[in-house]
Each structure stands twice: as C-alpha cells, then as structure tokens.
C-alpha cells in the first residue's frame, strides 16, 4: 500500500508541476496557448491521480501531497529551469517530506 501511494504521489506531482510549468511556459514565456492548454489538461490529470490514493480521506491525502509538491517543485526547477536550491530550500523540502511520512504512513491503530 505504501509503495502504491508513493507512486501515485510521484505521478500526481509530475502531472501538477508539469501542468503548471506548461501554463507558465505558454503565458509567461510566450510559447503560446497550446502549451497552456496542455498544462490545463495535465492539471486535470493530477486531480484524477489524487483520487486513486489508498487513503479515503481527502484532507489527509491533499495535505500530504502538499509536501510532495514542495519537494517536487524544487526538483523540477533543478531539472528543467537550471534552479539551484540553497540549503534552506533543501531543509524545508526535507521537513515537508517528513511531514508527508507522518501524515500518510504513521500507524493509526485502526
């Protein structure tokens, strides 16, 4: 269940961050409405991936995903935009990922 959940978080991050990046490229970098439109579609795919999480609680899944989004956005920026995070970015992302682990995978006794 944990492996499936992690895979779904990764897929959601690629769809959401990629979608937002495509919209950014289409509008801010003036690459055109096709890029922005593809981004909107990818953002919709992100929403679908969130519904496939094994945990049934919307608030928990989306709260935990927020941490994945933080770390994933920094990684995306490094891979595609030449962004270099400083130590505070890294510390913050690690803290977010620790929060993801607690929120999603801590034993709850039920």
From Swiss-Prot:
Domain of life from the UniProt record: Bacteria
Gene Ontology terms: cellular component: extracellular region; plasma membrane
Keywords from the named record: Cell membrane, Membrane, Transmembrane, Transmembrane helix
Protein family membership: Belongs to the UPF0060 family.
PANTHER family, sorted: UPF0060 MEMBRANE PROTEIN YNFA
Location relative to the cell: Cell membrane
Name of the molecule in the record: UPF0060 membrane protein Rv2639c
Recorded topology in the membrane: Multi-pass membrane protein
Bilayer-spanning residue ranges: 6-26, 32-52, 61-81, 90-110
InterPro entries found in the cross-reference section: UPF0060
């Amino acid at each position: 269940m944990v492996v499936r959940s992690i895979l779904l978080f990764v897929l959601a991050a690629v769809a959401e961050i990629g979608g937002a990046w495509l919209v950014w490229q289409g509008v801010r970098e003036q690459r055109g409405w096709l890029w922005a439109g593809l981004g909107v579609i990818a953002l919709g795919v992100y929403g679908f991936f969130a519904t496939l999480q094994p945990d049934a609680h919307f608030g928990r899944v989306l709260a935990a995903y927020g941490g994945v989004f933080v770390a994933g956005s920094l990684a995306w920026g490094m891979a595609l935009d030449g962004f270099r995070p400083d130590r505070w970015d890294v510390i913050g992302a690690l803290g977010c990922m620790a929060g993801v682990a607690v929120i999603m995978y801590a034993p709850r006794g039920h």
